[in-house]
Amino acid sequence: MARPRPREYKAGDLVFAKMKGYPHWPARIDELPEGAVKPPANKYPIFFFGTHETAFLGPKDLFPYKEYKDKFGKSNKRKGFNEGLWEIENNPGVKFTGYQTIQQQSSSETEGEGGNTADASSEEEGDRVEDGKGKRKNEKGGSKRKKSYTSKKSSKQSRKSPGDEDDKDCKEEENKSSSEGGDAGNDTRNTTADLQKAGEGT
């Protein structure tokens, strides 16, 4: 099917929006709230159904919802996609709740501080908008765990009596945090050496 020429959209138009790494997502051309970051030239503020994320996209990445419903409107395993299909059909006027909380914050800050709230609310808004669908990407990364140095300590300590070692653990943590700036490798070696000395002392 030939791709249509980019067209003009207005606030409230329902579309499928395409972002790299994601399927064509059910979305709406959004109106800009007061104090929000202005979009770059030739880009529209987009509200994604299902996830309630926002982004700025050009007309070449937008497809009219009614015309492309059969092509892109099939259910998908992607988190939030099926909810988005339901929302665009049953609740197309759903609002992004973050706008309301930002407006409430800015009005309370104006009363309390007397002024510079437009900058604060636009910064918060800008972070959300710049992320676009970034939160969905980061959800995968959030479940990863970082390795910690405590796994070596706990395996050695589990061989010793737990009651005596609790006090030593606290002292070792204090020593470790108060030690003068060394690199992470030296800190680990010192901790291991301290454990060996502590084991010999008991």
From Swiss-Prot:
Species: Mus musculus
GO cellular component, one term: cytoplasm
PTM-bearing positions, type Phosphoserine: S121, S122, S161
Region feature (Disordered): 90-202
Lipid metabolism recorded as keyword: no
Pfam families in UniProt: PWWP
PANTHER family xrefs: HDGF LIKE 3, HEPATOMA-DERIVED GROWTH FACTOR-RELATED
Keywords linked to the UniProt accession: Growth factor, Nucleus, Phosphoprotein
Protein name: Hepatoma-derived growth factor-related protein 3
Residue ranges, compositional bias (Basic and acidic residues): 168-177
MF terms in GO: chromatin binding; growth factor activity; microtubule binding; tubulin binding
UniProt motif Nuclear localization signal: location: 135-147
